[in-house]
């Protein structure tokens, strides 16, 4: 399908996923300059007043880039909003996003019609992340413009479904923008996501191992050194199932193979408990085996571009 504005001006079919604590203006700006959507969670900007400063910085730097590089303008950026009832900042954060006319808003953990209407009112679009077809239908019913299918293997809060099954079920009825998340970390995986019916790939964990990311050196090296077998799926830490690096769980004195279930009722995005969980226990997806070094975000995106072009060429030879 032809993607709607502003998703139609990417140099690569990628959205850099919003990473709690890790994503910051430096990373977002680097991603956008490299030609992919850069994003960050609104809750990363603490206190709330910092969100206005971040959006000013991102908007100003990308505008300056576009003026200096008219032949390779920056991709748009996105802000992730947690729509869960425990997020007491939502209304104020949305007002700040409206002030800066944020082009893309990614919504999570709840779909609200008024949020989607608000974004559309200032000319933006909303993408809602979901883990199954039922939630996908609810999101579109509430007015989301597109969907992010979070399949098995994705970093952070993630679903259990195969990407083949999840994309298939959604594409049976939805022909709008569809982004796939789950262990996508190289150019071949981006092409595979498109082949199964997604429009764009959603890549998060590899960007933890970038120079711009707000992550401890040990966290970055854990991504570089980790493999799929080093990822643990648990609901203990936030009340919602997610994927985490085994070594960080062990460092906290816990047994990764014997973790109790978390309680969904304890999920709280307003009091800082989430920040503590994600700072001590490191989220990561299963695709990190493709990450080989800590490097600038632009270098990683350039590598993805080369791999993506090579994968397309090789596939054409196989099908000729």
Regions found by a protein language model. Give the residues of each.
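Active-site entrance/lid segments in N-terminal catalytic domains of soluble metabolic enzymes
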Residues: 1-177
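Conserved active-site-proximal phosphate/metal-binding subdomains
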Residues: 160-179, 185-320
């Amino acid at each position: 399908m032809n993607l709607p504005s502003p998703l139609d001006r990417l140099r690569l079919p990628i959205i850099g996923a919003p990473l709690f604590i890790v994503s910051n203006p430096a990373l977002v700006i680097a991603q956008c300059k490299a030609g992919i959507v850069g994003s960050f969670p609104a809750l990363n900007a603490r206190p709330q007043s910092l969100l206005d400063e971040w959006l000013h910085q991102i908007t100003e730097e990308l505008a300056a880039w576009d003026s200096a590089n008219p032949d390779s303008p920056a991709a748009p950026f996105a802000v992730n909003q947690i729509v869960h009832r425990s997020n007491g900042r939502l209304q104020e954060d949305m007002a700040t996003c409206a002030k800066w006319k944020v082009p893309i808003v990614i919504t999570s953990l709840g779909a609200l019609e008024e949020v989607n209407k608000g974004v559309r009112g200032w000319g933006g679009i909303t993408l809602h992340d979901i883990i199954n077809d039922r939630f996908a239908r609810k999101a579109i019913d509430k007015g989301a413009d597109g969907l992010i299918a979070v399949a098995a293997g994705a970093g952070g809060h993630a679903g259990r479904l195969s990407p083949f099954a999840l994309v298939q079920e959604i594409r049976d009825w939805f022909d709008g923008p569809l982004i796939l998340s789950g262990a996508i970390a190289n150019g071949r995986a981006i092409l595979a996501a498109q082949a199964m019916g997604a429009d764009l790939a959603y890549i998060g964990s590899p960007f933890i191992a970038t120079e711009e990311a707000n992550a401890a050196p040990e966290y970055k090296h854990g991504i570089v050194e980790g493999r799929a077998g080093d990822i643990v799926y648990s609901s203990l830490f936030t009340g919602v199932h997610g994927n985490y690096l085994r070594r960080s769980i062990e460092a906290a004195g816990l047994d990764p193979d014997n973790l109790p279930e978390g309680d969904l009722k304890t999920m709280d995005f307003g009091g800082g408990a989430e920040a503590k969980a994600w700072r001590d226990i490191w989220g990561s997806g299963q695709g990190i085996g493709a990450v080989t070094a800590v490097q600038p975000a632009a270098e990683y995106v350039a590598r993805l571009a080369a791999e993506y072009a090579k994968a397309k060429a090789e596939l054409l030879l196989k099908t000729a």
